[in-house]
């Protein structure tokens, strides 16, 4: 009995000891000054404890191992924390005010009266916030490399630090190798911590102020208000401007510092809730600790929780990722030795892509290789991460990809005559189709069953739902349609009720309502099949789908169908034969386009033009056809494609989609449910898009 009581007592003590620890947030700090501030916070708020490490990398390792839970990092370190070997993610962003701005400006600052500009920095002395940091290293050095001021062939040639050492006469870049030219101007141990007096924004400015350096790469707020008149910004065009002109004279806008932690939603919520509940302690002040920007930047005004799907790549954006990659590039090689990694969605597309790869082999190499993903959105993520390079997508997906910093580079052309003499931009008509004699019109759709190509796609969702939203001003489309199939919808949604899956005896339900070709009602042909098989009353598709799938042109399930058995629903409430699409349609919309990262545009265009000459509609090699699909319809490209045409360099996704489409999307985006988690993550910052 005594033994049982003792065991019970020990169990209670263990529980009592573990409970507070479970709720405690272990904050990682990098200096004695930060440790003092953290201890003061922990004394006020018992839910915090402090873990001391030597630097950001050591903190990242400690968080991965569970020794610590969180730290605030700048963009360069957020990139490192998100790499596969660490697997951390940003969970909370600093907000610097000015209408909730989670971005800041990276600038180059010099003393007033010194006679040089950004284009004449060679041989000058430089002050950096730290090696690998956003404003202090990645942005300025990336810009100098991109502009060919710093000549660097790649890491196979030599480290970028070596090229920077040759460019500047001397520097202080905390975190560089002690004894190197990059540490020559430093005042302390050149460590990436407050042990080095010239570390971080305040330190880099002090390096400039003390006369150690000629230029400091910092943020504008690092220059004290009382001293602004003595300093100037160096603009990228070679001119100078006042410190307060940073909005027009800067190197880049970069994502705010963010709190990173392990990929654990419960832990992320706990950290955020504990931080916002802090009272009687100023998280955003470092007064009294003999340093600045401790734990958080002093310029932060509040904290903003990030969408749960946000990872470091989505947080930083394609443009900033491109800058970081430019500093980690391998030695450049000719385009002829490169292969572009095409992203295929689902097994059927992967099969066609593999065939494309095999047929593209020449001289021991192929110009195309294949990656696969379960959805287009996952492909967009892969392209952002450089795990894939390109994919052809619908206009709605061009919109999402554009929000994520990717660019449209080639467009499908459906008119063979325009392949040799292009006129206006390639386009198609979004139409509403019903069975002839159904009595259905555009005005009587409410309460009916709907067939969509996919959630967020142009003809199948964005255009019809955008029009319906303009009429009803109601974002709950389940009140409008009784049920339907819109692949990509939440499982259990009325818009999954009519989906079919793959039809396979095993695993068929796994594909049900998924936005991939295994779902038999996915895509243009799938939405039409949904109508044909009486799973829906109306199909929202492209104008060519009915003739392509009927009168003996379609697959087995459509072999007995006649195009005359179907009709178009016009917006004025009338109906028309399917041949009258130019008069009876919901919208004229841009064709599907190939998207990629900004820095791979040239390679993707040149290789696709080369492959098109070989495997296009009138290509020289008939062993493979890029624009034909044998197993299923519209794999990799739409089967109606006659050629791919280059989109003029510099064309923004907004210009490609056109004013009408953008207006429709902006209307639809008033409905938060119509915005994907990916798009929400990509549009969290105002600075993720290229200016």
Swiss-Prot record:
Limits of the Transferrin-like domain: 25-329, 340-670
InterPro entries, A to Z: Transferrin, Transferrin-like_dom, Transferrin_Fe_BS
MF GO annotations: metal ion binding
Glycosylation sites: 169
Binding positions (Fe(3+) 1): 74, 104, 201, 257
Disulfide bridge positions per record: 28-50, 127-207, 172-186, 235-249, 343-379, 353-370, 404-682, 419-643, 451-530, 475-671, 485-499, 496-513, 570-584
GO biological-process terms attached to the record: antibacterial humoral response; iron ion transport
GO CC annotation, single: recycling endosome
Residues annotated to bind hydrogencarbonate 1: 129, 134, 136-137
Annotated localization: Secreted
Keywords attached to this entry: Disulfide bond, Glycoprotein, Ion transport, Iron, Iron transport, Metal-binding, Repeat, Secreted, Signal, Transport
Tissue occurrence: Abundant in liver and serum with smaller amounts found in the stomach and kidney.
Key word Ribosomal protein present: no
Signal peptide range: 1-18
Pfam families: Transferrin
Main subcellular location: secreted
Function of the protein: Transferrins are iron binding transport proteins which can bind two Fe(3+) ions in association with the binding of an anion, usually bicarbonate. It is responsible for the transport of iron from sites of absorption and heme degradation to those of storage and utilization. Serum transferrin may also have a further role in stimulating cell proliferation.
Subunit structure: Monomer.
Family stated for the protein in its record: Belongs to the transferrin family.
Record-given protein name: Serotransferrin-2
Gene name in the database record: tf2
């Amino acid at each position: 009995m005594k033994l049982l009581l003792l065991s019970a007592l020990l169990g209670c003590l263990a529980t009592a000891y573990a409970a507070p620890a479970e709720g405690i947030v272990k904050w990682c700090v990098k200096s004695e000054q930060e440790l003092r501030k953290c201890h003061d916070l922990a004394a006020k708020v018992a839910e915090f404890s402090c873990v001391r490490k030597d630097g950001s990398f050591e903190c990242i390792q400690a968080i991965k191992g569970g020794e610590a839970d969180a730290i605030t990092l700048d963009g360069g370190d957020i990139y490192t924390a998100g790499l596969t070997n660490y697997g951390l993610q940003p969970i909370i962003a600093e907000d610097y005010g000015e209408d909730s701005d989670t971005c800041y400006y990276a600038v180059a600052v010099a003393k007033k009266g010194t006679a040089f500009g950004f284009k004449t920095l060679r041989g000058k002395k430089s002050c950096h916030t730290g090696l690998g940091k956003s404003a202090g290293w990645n942005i300025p050095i990336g810009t100098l490399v991109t502009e060919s001021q710093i000549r660097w062939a790649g890491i196979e040639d030599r480290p970028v630090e070596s090229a920077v050492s040759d460019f500047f006469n001397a520097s202080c870049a905390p975190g560089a190798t002690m004894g190197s030219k990059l540490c020559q101007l430093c005042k302390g141990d050149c460590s990436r911590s407050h042990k080095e007096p010239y570390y971080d924004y305040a330190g880099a400015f002090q390096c400039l102020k003390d006369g150690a350096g000629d230029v400091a790469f910092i943020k504008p707020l690092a220059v004290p208000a009382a001293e602004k008149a003595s300093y100037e910004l160096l603009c990228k065009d070679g001119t100078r401007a006042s410190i307060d002109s940073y909005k027009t004279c800067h190197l880049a806008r970069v994502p705010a510092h963010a709190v990173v932690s392990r990929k654990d939603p419960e832990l992320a919520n706990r950290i955020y809730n504990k931080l916002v509940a802090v009272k009687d302690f100023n998280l955003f002040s470092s007064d009294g600790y003999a340093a600045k920007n401790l734990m958080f930047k002093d310029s932060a005004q509040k904290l903003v929780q990030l969408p749960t799907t946000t990872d470091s790549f989505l947080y930083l954006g394609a443009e900033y990722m491109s800058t970081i990659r430019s500093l980690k590039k391998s030695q450049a090689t000719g385009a002829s030795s490169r292969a572009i990694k095409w992203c295929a969605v689902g097994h059927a597309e992967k099969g066609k892509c593999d065939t494309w790869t095999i047929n593209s082999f020449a001289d021991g190499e192929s110009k195309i290789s294949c990656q696969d993903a379960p959805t287009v959105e996952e492909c967009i993520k892969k392209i952002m991460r450089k795990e894939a390079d390109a994919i052809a997508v619908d206009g709605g997906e061009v919109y999402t990809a554009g929000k994520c910093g990717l660019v449209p580079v080639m467009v499908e052309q459906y008119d063979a005559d325009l392949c040799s003499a292009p006129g206006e931009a390639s386009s198609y008509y979004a139409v509403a189709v019903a069975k002839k004699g159904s009595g259905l019109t555009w005005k009587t759709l409410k309460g009916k069953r709907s067939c969509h190509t996919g959630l967020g796609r142009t003809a199948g969702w964005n255009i019809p739902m955008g029009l319906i939203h303009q009429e009803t001003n109601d974002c709950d489309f389940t009140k409008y349609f009784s049920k339907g199939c819109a692949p990509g919808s939440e499982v259990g949604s009325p818009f999954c009720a009519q989906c079919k899956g793959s039809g396979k005896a095993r695993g068929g339900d796994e594909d049900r309502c998924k936005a991939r070709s295994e779902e038999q009602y996915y895509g243009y042909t799938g939405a039409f099949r949904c109508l044909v098989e009486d799973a829906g009353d109306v199909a929202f598709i492209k104008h060519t789908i009915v003739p392509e799938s009927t009168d003996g042109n379609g697959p087995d399930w459509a072999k007995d169908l006649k195009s005359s058995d179907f009709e178009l629903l016009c917006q004025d409430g009338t109906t028309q034969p399917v041949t009258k699409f130019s008069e009876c349609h919901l919208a004229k919309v841009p064709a599907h386009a190939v998207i990629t990262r900004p820095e791979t545009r040239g390679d993707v265009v040149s290789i696709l033009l080369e492959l098109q000459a070989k495997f296009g509609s009138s290509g020289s090699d008939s062993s493979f056809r890029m624009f034909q699909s044998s197993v299923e319809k519209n794999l990799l490209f739409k089967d109606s494609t006659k050629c791919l045409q280059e989109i003029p360099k510099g064309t923004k996704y907004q210009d490609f989609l056109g004013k009408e489409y953008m207006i429709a999307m902006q209307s639809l985006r008033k409905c938060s449910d119509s915005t994907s988690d990916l798009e929400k993550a990509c549009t969290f910052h105002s600075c993720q898009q290229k200016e």
